[in-house]
Every structure is written in C-alpha cells, then in structure tokens.
Design a protein with these regions (language model features):
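Adenine nucleotide-associated cytosolic modules
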Residues: 3-168
Length: 168
C-alpha cells in the first residue's frame, strides 16, 4: 500500500477500512491495522510516500499484480506507464459521484490505460472526489470488483476485464 495522506473525516463514508478513531492517523497505518485485525496471518507492507516517476519502478518490482486505486490522473498514468514498461499486469479503478469504472491490463492481451485514454485531462478539468463527492457504496462496489480482478488473475480462473472498460 502506498499512501502519504492522513485519514480525514471526509474519507470515512467511502473508505470503510478507517474509523473515527483513525482520523489524523496515516492512512497506510490505519489500513494495515484494520487488515491485520481482520486476519492476523496477512502480511501488509506499507510505504508512506507518494508514487513518483523516480520511485515507481522500485515500488512495483516485487509484486505480481498491481492494483491502482489512486484518485488522481497523473498517478494513474504513471502507474500505467510503469506497469507497461515493467511488463506487470494491473487493474485500474476510478470512482466519482454515482459512477465508477474498472479495467485490467495484462501484457500482450489488451490495451493499457493510456491506450484507452491517451493523456490526463487538463488540470482542474475534472473535479476531485472531495469537490464532486462520492457515494460511499460506489467505492465498495468498484473496490470489490477490482479485488475480484486480482483474485482471478492470481488463481488463473475467470474472465478478466482485459480489453474492456467496465462502467457502472
């Protein structure tokens, strides 16, 4: 998990991994504590830093499948480009208001995020989740579908959203 931010009250309605008691705590610390409380046998590695062009290749190198749940376009394109360069499969998800989208990239099996969307939109052309709002259940719906993409890839069963963009 890579996140530099702290838990904010506005996060709680859509990021159910955190609680009121976690406000002000580093998101990666709060999320790790919750996951370990649910399953003490899980191993959670956290990195409290922004993903940048300088560190992205190092951050993804040890993982078999990358899940992009970022909330900004520069990060989404950076993760896409790094995964394409490294030959890493990944799942993109995005949510805003009552809408969500999801796609999975597997090298050699379909287009990547940049292939579909070309370039990030101009700064301030699309409102942030904080500006536009997100219905909390949307994060759960899209997050669950994204988790299923990772599970399907890892176990080699089921049809992935490769070459398709699911919109909800």
């Amino acid at each position: 998990m890579y996140k530099r931010q702290e838990v904010d009250l506005s996060n709680l309605q859509r990021q159910i991994i955190h609680s009121i008691a976690d406000i002000g705590k580093a998101k990666v610390k709060s999320a790790k504590e919750t996951m370990e409380a649910i399953n003490p046998d899980v191993t959670v590695k956290t990195y409290r830093e922004f993903v940048t062009s300088e560190n992205v290749m190092e951050l993804i190198k040890d993982y078999d499948f990358i899940i992009d749940g970022t909330d900004n376009f520069p990060a989404k394109f950076l993760i896409n480009d790094a995964c394409v360069m490294a030959g890493k499969p990944f799942s993109h998800a995005g949510i805003i208001r009552f809408k969500g989208q999801l796609m999975t990239y597997v090298p050699g099996e379909g287009p990547c995020y940049r292939c579909v969307f070309k370039n990030p939109p101009p700064k301030d052309a699309v409102p942030t989740c904080k500006q536009a709002g997100v219905i909390g259940a949307m994060g759960g719906v899209i997050g669950s579908l994204q988790a299923m993409e990772a599970i399907k890839y890892i176990i080699g069963k089921g049809d992935l959203l490769t070459g398709r963009l699911l919109t909800y």
